[in-house]
Amino acid sequence: MRQLVSFQLDAEEYGVDVLSVREIIRLPAITKTPNAPDYVDGIINLRGTVVPIISLRKRFGLLEKEHDRHSRILVMEVGGRLTGFIVDAVTEVIRLSSGSIQPPPSLVSSGSAQDCLTGVINHGEQLLIVVEPGRLLGDMEHGVYDEAA
């Protein structure tokens, strides 16, 4: 049995393995960092740890929108370091049988932003896209942490 934390970006549902998520927090004040890549919103202080904050909307090439009371940061460990990812809303924890995740169609899973998409699930009336946290930054990871340091 596998569990995913599901979240929304725009009208789409995404999911990440629950074991990847350290915590889910409301958006605190985010400190902007100079010369950071456009997908990096800045950094936060999370109980004494400086955590870079990535906008998944920007990372996935979606239009920006104002954060609201539903916006959250998924704090995940990526490459041994804590990283926060801003999402529109966190919706639920889903329990899955191991065979329920199907590979994404090749047209959907090609391209730099889509490299992190690892599967698709039929979840009720809609499809849920499974994301691999370790691939969310890809080749950009070193620049993110250099900027946050």
Segments and roles (model prediction):
Residues 1-149:
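An acidic, low-aromatic, low-complexity terminal/linker signal
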